Amino acid sequence: MEESMKKLPILLTIFVVLGLLATSLVVVHSSSAASLEEAIAKTPVGTEKGQINPDAPKGYLGIPGAPSLNLIAGLLWAIWVGWIFSSVGAFGGIMAGVGHLTVFGLGDYAKTFKNTSPALNKLVTDSIRVSNQWLVGLSAAISSLNYYRMGRLVAPLGIALAVGSVGGSILIPILTAGKIKLSAYQGYFGLAVFIIGGFLFYENTPRGQSRKKEAKAAAQAFEKSIKEKKTAAELTAMGVKVTNFGLTSVSFTFFGVEFHFNPIVAAIGGLFIAALASFLGIGGGFLFVPFLTSVAGLPMYLVAGTSALTVFVGMVVSIFSYMVLKATMVQWSLIGMELIGIFIGSMIGPRTSKYIPDIWLKRLFVVLAVYVGLRYVSKGFFGTSWVPPY
């Protein structure tokens, strides 16, 4: 009973926010459709690339000749997206982007209109950005609840980051919606991922790990408890406990190890991270993870849940900004199926991540960052992928 009451406020908050967001989106649907029809009308008619054939079957967003999406493939890909985000607190938006841009072919499709119909190019690009964020938003909500129940979420730190993230999540859609071409989006997307991957690679070196004694000690204590097969209740009891709360300093313990952070620094970090994440059309977890491990000094076992809480707030604000303030459209049939997959993957991730050593969670992060970064830097800035699929 006490546990249920403990998580009730978070559940109610998430459902209220999602309800308000959904209501607002229904109101602006007609405006979004009008923008799409106007962009299609300005596109040259024909059967060549960069042209619209009115007689072709309707595909993505109802555009004649656009890719026809396989909803089952969307479901399966979303399970992977939900699992990876809920396991490491990052790469949900990036993997959603890989699916929408590459697996479904929306990236190459949008590129065909680069010169013939810039308005349609940018409209599809914005749609991809928001679609990514819908998937990450739900995964973040589910992951936050799961990790909170497990005692693996630092709520004060997540809230401080979220407060700062609100400004960035509002500002970027207003400044960039309808102004970013697909090629530039892909290039910047990959560059940001590649840089962060290199940063996390350094943290995996002996020199990088030597600076994180508290995180290493806490991770070892947690891993020892898992090997001893302690019950879920015992693990939760040794989880996050806030011992001191102040405007400039917050302290908490995790498996007997004490940690400290400055909420003001966290809020400032959240502002810049959310701004970049909103521009890239992703959740920002791949930026929050290095912030939480390097600046806050947390072990990976606390990073996923704390990152998820912050990402959830940023995603709600950013989706609202894109779809309500800038009338961006999404393919609701695809999003609906993908959200089912996200739910499945996000329920599995927190339950499997505890069996993966802390260092291997970081290494998984690095491998994915290098692959995704190389692919989109090369495709965005050089016109061809250096890694498969080419």
Give the positions of each predicted feature.
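Juxtamembrane transmembrane-helix boundary motif
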Residues: 2-86, 102, 106-117, 122, ...
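Short, non-helical or kinked segments that cap or interrupt transmembrane helices
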Residues: 87-104, 111, 124-131, 152-159, ...
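Transmembrane helix-bundle signature of multi-pass membrane transporters/permeases
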Residues: 99, 129-136, 162-166, 304-315, ...
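Hydrophobic alpha-helical transmembrane segments
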Residues: 106-111, 129-143, 203-210, 253-254, ...
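Alpha-helix capping/termination and helix-coil
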Residues: 275, 279, 283, 295-299, ...
